[in-house]
A protein has these predicted regions:
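Solvent-exposed beta-strand/loop surfaces, strongest in extracytoplasmic domains of secreted
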Residues: 1-308
């Protein structure tokens, strides 16, 4: 035009924009909840003005470890895919182990029963975990014995030990088990017949007649609730107080041992022994002297004598 004539053609190219979409890195200490971060950063040439995309971030990490912070995107309606070369880069989600000490307190259960002659038992333990920790009873296993049984009076232990408990959750790197053993205690029952609830009966020892020998008279003690006659020196002891040879009253002190406790007393008598004196019959004509006759004594203990 004007001072010029002729024509020629010039071409040019509109190139695609290079866009990099990068999801966020994130990290936290394990707390039992999922670690997520839905931030996506647009880099490279970025989107043209008023163009963009929406994002669906699906990355999640709950347990100790790491994983990609995955996501998907969808271009908005005014944004043509043909105008872009889009590269996705996933960030890293990392959960680290709880670094503080977790103390798990195991307390074996305890119970006390009075002796009845039947088996008693205690089972189980209670768990207490450091306040504020997310550690739970399901995070460890128990491989020991948590039940104790017994019949006789005494104390029985479960045998709980720290090594019976194992942490199975790698999210916690410092778990300590503090264990108090469980126990069953069976206390002796009263042996006193006057304690009606005890069900104990005792016979009265028989009286004896003096014979010059020791009279250590027995008695029978029965536990009517177990249906058993008690055994001397296993269930009780006997102490004889007083002279057990000569005439008088003897006291027996009965003291419970083993499965029985307490004491009571019984008494019996050693009564006088009867003896007879028989004299012979005799006669004479008076001569101013005394008439005497022999005789015999019956019922006297050998080695003893009576004068008359």
């Amino acid at each position: 035009i004007g001072n010029y004539e002729g024509s020629f053609e010039v071409t040019y190219e509109i190139t695609k924009r290079h866009v990099t979409l990068t999801s966020a890195d994130d990290e936290k200490v394990y707390d039992g909840s999922a670690l997520t971060n839905d931030t996506v950063t647009v880099g490279g040439d970025k989107f043209a003005k008023r163009e963009s995309a929406t994002y669906n971030v699906t990355g999640s990490q709950t347990e100790v470890g790491s994983s990609q912070n995955t996501f998907a995107y969808e271009l908005k309606t005014n944004t043509k895919a043909s105008n872009y070369i889009i590269t996705k880069e996933f960030g890293k989600l990392t959960v680290t182990a709880e670094d503080g000490e977790v103390v798990v307190v195991i307390t074996g259960r305890k119970d006390t029963f009075e002796y009845t002659g039947t088996e008693k038992s205690v089972k189980g333990y209670d768990v207490s975990i450091t306040a504020g920790s997310t550690y739970a009873e399901s995070d460890f296993t128990f491989s020991g014995n948590d039940e104790v049984k017994g019949t006789e009076a005494g104390t029985y232990y479960m045998g709980l030990k720290p090594e019976d408990f194992t942490n199975n959750n790698e999210n916690y790197g410092n778990v300590t088990f503090r264990v108090t053993d469980g126990q069953l205690t069976i206390t002796p029952k009263s042996i006193n017949p006057e304690d009606e609830k005890s069900g104990i009966t005792a016979t009265d020892p028989e009286d004896s007649t003096y014979n010059g020998e020791a009279h250590v008279n027995p008695l029978k003690v029965t536990d009517t609730k177990t249906g058993k006659d008690l055994v001397e020196n296993k269930d009780y002891t006997l102490t004889y107080v007083g002279d057990v040879v000569n005439v008088g009253t003897v006291k027996i002190e009965v003291k419970g041992i083993g499965n029985y406790t307490g004491e009571f007393t019984k008494t019996y008598k050693i009564t006088p022994r009867e003896y007879t004196v028989t004299t012979n019959t005799d006669s004479k004509v008076y001569d101013g002297t005394a008439l005497t006759a022999g005789g015999k004594i019956e019922g006297i203990i050998d080695g003893e004598d009576v004068e008359f």
